[in-house]
A protein has these predicted regions:
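Non-catalytic N-lobe/flap surface of aspartyl protease domains
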Residues: 1-78, 105-108, 113-116, 120-167, ...
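Short acidic, glycine-rich loop/turn motifs
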Residues: 41, 89-91, 168-172
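C-terminal helix/juxtamembrane-tail motif
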Residues: 74-78, 87-90, 211-214, 219-234
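A short acidic-Thr-Gly-centered motif at the start of a beta-strand
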Residues: 84-103, 198-201
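Well-ordered beta-strand scaffold positions
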Residues: 85-87, 92, 112, 174, ...
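Active-site proximal loops enriched in glycine and acidic residues that flank catalytic Cys/His/Asp
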Residues: 110, 118-121, 170-172, 179-182, ...
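A conserved acidic, glycine/proline-rich C-terminal tail/linker
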Residues: 178-212
Length: 234
């Protein structure tokens, strides 16, 4: 079933959550409750979706690189909750209390395009990112739709575009260091926008969307209750 959204068209949705109708619940024993996927940076690129043994290989890599975090049960067992503890911009940890992230919980969801953050966290992120972008000489641009409000004009730039690094930090110290395509959403050359958005309220559930997951292998081990991620997988 095709579906349209603000960021384009999808062919359909494959349910991999922990709800009763999910493929992982219906065939979980066959695949040992494990799956992994990688979303490519380029729409024409090749990603993958692995179940069972293939996902176990990804899990071993995530453990070796210390890039895994506990899978939490926050407001029910359906979603894949994780404990986010901080955000770094340019290698510097932003002044955001951990309680801001734990207030409503955070899930990993490949069906959501843009990551949603509590307003208090998003405000610190956009301020730090805009400051670093200004230091690099980029010109600000008007927002693109209501959701993306921190945009820049890249007209006339050639070659590699340098960006401040952005990292999400999780329980256990695991760090998701964004690929460049996970930092900016380029609507067009005059509108390259910070690919994060604020929820309406700090009490709204936060979401790590597919844009921020690009090029990483995301591994889910339901039995061990861990989520792992490995960079440069596709």
């Amino acid at each position: 079933m095709a579906a349209w959204g603000l960021f384009g068209q999808s062919a359909g949705v494959l349910g991999l959550d922990r709800g009763r109708t999910s493929l992982m619940v219906q065939a979980g024993n066959k695949y040992s409750g494990m799956f992994a996927y990688c979303l490519p940076a380029d729409p024409s690129g090749t990603g993958f979706l692995d179940f069972g043994p293939g996902a176990a290989t990804m899990a071993a890599v995530a453990v070796k690189e210390a890039r895994q975090t506990p899978m939490l049960t926050y407001k029910g067992p359906r979603y894949y909750y994780v404990g986010m503890t901080g955000i770094k911009v340019g290698g510097h940890l932003l002044p955001i209390s951990r309680s801001v992230f734990s207030a409503a919980g955070m899930i990993v969801d490949s069906g959501t395009v843009i990551t949603r953050l509590p307003p208090l966290a998003y405000r610190q992120l956009r301020l730090a990112f805009a400051k670093d972008m200004a230091a690099l000489g980029y010109q600000k641009a008007p927002g693109w739709f209501e959701m993306l409000d921190t945009c820049f004009n890249l007209t006339g730039l050639q070659g590699i575009v340098l960006l401040p690094t952005v990292s999400l930090v999780f329980q256990g110290g695991a760090s998701l260091d964004m690929d460049a395509t996970g930092i900016l959403y380029v609507a067009n050359v005059s509108h390259a926008c910070l690919a994060f958005a604020a929820n309406n309220r700090n009490s709204d559930m936060a979401v790590i969307g597919s844009t921020q997951q690009k090029t990483y292998s995301f591994m889910y081990d339901i039995g061990k209750k861990v989520v792992g991620f490995t960079p440069g997988a596709c």
